[in-house]
Structure formats: C-alpha cells, structure tokens
Amino acid sequence: MARFVVVALLVLLSLSGLEAIQHAPKIQVYSRHPAENGKPNFLNCYVSGFHPSDIEVDLLKNGKKIEKVEHSDLSFSKDWSFYLLYYTEFTPNEKDEYACRVSHVTLSTPKTVKWDRNM
C-alpha cells in the first residue's frame, strides 16, 4: 500500500511539473497547393511545439478575422508539446493578403505570420 501511495505521489508531482513548462508556438502558414490567382485552394496555419495547451489562432484576410475556419483536434507530441492545424478555403489573387495570428501565454503580444505565396 505504501508503495502505491509513493508511486501515485510521484506521478502527480511529475504531471504538475508539466504545467510549469512553457514553450512558445512555432507558426507555419502555407497553401495546400501552389498558389494560382483565381484558383480555389486551402490556407493552412500549422501551430506546433507549444505548452501549455491554451491557445487562440485566427486566420486573417487583409487584417480581418476569417469566420469560416476549421481546425484539427488538439494533439500532443512525444515531448508533451501541443500542435494544431487551422485551415480554410480561399481563392488567392494579387491584392488580398492572408495571415495567421496566434495568442499564447508565452507571447507578450499576439504573433502574426503572413502567408508567402511563393513558399
């Protein structure tokens, strides 16, 4: 019984220690297919390597939040950091700018990464 209590306490201590670890998110913005003006595509924002799990991600068109956005389930890597994919349909053209804005406890202000059509 005492052995079980010690093991349980060690597990609880290790889990509580995970909350103290903080890692800033890595943000990648890309399209599913090479960009062609006037051709429908998908805009993706892959956010990875962050901890804790609370995060806010917005896809932007000309600085304004895109409302019709979907995302994957929150998942975690072997190192217990988290990752997500946000995506939406879009049709690129010469004038519109697209970006991904992320808010996380590790960032003093939200970070915005622009989509580069040549990537």
Curated annotation (Swiss-Prot):
GO terms for biological process: antigen processing and presentation of peptide antigen via MHC class I; immune response. SUPFAM superfamilies: Immunoglobulin. The keyword Transcription does not apply. Belongs to the beta-2-microglobulin family. Residues 1-20 form the signal peptide. CDD domains: IgC1_beta2m. Heterodimer of an alpha chain and a beta chain. Beta-2-microglobulin is the beta-chain of major histocompatibility complex class I molecules. It comes from the Eukaryota. Residues 25-114 form the Ig-like C1-type domain. It is found in: Secreted. This is Beta-2-microglobulin. Component of the class I major histocompatibility complex (MHC). Involved in the presentation of peptide antigens to the immune system. Disulfide bonds join 45-100. InterPro entries: B2Microglobulin, Ig-like_dom, Ig-like_dom_sf, Ig-like_fold, Ig/MHC_CS, Ig_C1-set, MHC/Immunoglobulin. Its main location: secreted. GO terms for cellular component: extracellular region; MHC class I protein complex. The keyword ATP-binding does not apply. Keywords: Disulfide bond, Immunity, Immunoglobulin domain, MHC I, Secreted, Signal. Pfam families: C1-set (PF07654). It comes from Aotus nancymaae (Ma's night monkey).
